[in-house]
C-alpha cells in the first residue's frame, strides 16, 4: 500500500462505506480503524447496519479530510485543500474475541488518545464482544487524491484586482 494512502487512512475520522442493496446504491458513515491493509468497523450485532456487510460483499470506502478553505477573487476558483482516499475491497466478519478486543481497544485509542482501562473506562467483557459485530474490509484497490496550496484564480496575485484571496484553516 503506498505511504500516502496509508497516511490519509490513518488521519481520517469518518469512513463512508458504499454498497449496492437490491440494485440500489447505499452509503453509511462509520468510525473506523485502519491497520495493515484493512479497514475495521464495529457495531451492535442486533443492529441491521452491519448485517448488510456480510462476508464477501464488495464495498467502496471513501475517507476525506478537509484541511483549508481557499478563497479566490474569482467565483469559479474557490476551492479547498484536502486529502482523500477511495478504496475498494471485500468484507470479512471477525469472530475471534481476542482480535475483537484488540481492534476495539485500538479504535478507542485512535479517537480518545490517552484513555485507558480500567482507570478511564471498563474493558469490554467477552459478553460485550460476543454482542459486537466486527467487520474487516480487506483493501484490494485504493486511490488517493489531494490538493494543497493557495488561490489560483486569474487575478489572485494582482494586488489591485477587486476582491480578496486567502486560505482559511478548516
Task: Please report, for each region that a protein language model flagged, where it lies by residue.
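Short, basic/aromatic recognition patches
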Residues: 1-16
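Short beta-strand segments
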Residues: 12-45, 61, 75-77
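Short helix-to-loop capping/linker segments positioned immediately adjacent to catalytic or ligand/cofactor-binding
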Residues: 16-21, 49, 74, 91-96, ...
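A structural signal for short, well-ordered beta-strand segments
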Residues: 32, 89-91, 139
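Short, structured beta-strand-loop surface elements
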Residues: 45-106
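C-terminal edge-of-domain segments
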Residues: 95-170
Amino acid at each position: 500500500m503506498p505511504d500516502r494512502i496509508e497516511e490519509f487512512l490513518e488521519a481520517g475520522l469518518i469512513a463512508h462505506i458504499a454498497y449496492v442493496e437490491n440494485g440500489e446504491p447505499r452509503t453509511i458513515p462509520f468510525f473506523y480503524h485502519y491497520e495493515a491493509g484493512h479497514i475495521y468497523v464495529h457495531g451492535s450485532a442486533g443492529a441491521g447496519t452491519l448485517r448488510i456487510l456480510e462476508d464477501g460483499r464488495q464495498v467502496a470506502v471513501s475517507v476525506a479530510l478537509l484541511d483549508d478553505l481557499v478563497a479566490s477573487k474569482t467565483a469559479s476558483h474557490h476551492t479547498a485543500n484536502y486529502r482523500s482516499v477511495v478504496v475498494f475491497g471485500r468484507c470479512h466478519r471477525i469472530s475471534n474475541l481476542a482480535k475483537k478486543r484488540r481492534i476495539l481497544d485500538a479504535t478507542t485509542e485512535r479517537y480518545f488518545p490517552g484513555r485507558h482501562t480500567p482507570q478511564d473506562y471498563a474493558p469490554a467483557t467477552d459478553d460485550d464482544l460476543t454482542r459486537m459485530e466486527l467487520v474487516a474490509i480487506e483493501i484490494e484497490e485504493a486511490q488517493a487524491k489531494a490538493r494543497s496550496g493557495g488561490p489560483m484564480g486569474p487575478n489572485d496575485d494582482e494586488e489591485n484586482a477587486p476582491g480578496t484571496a486567502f486560505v482559511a484553516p478548516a
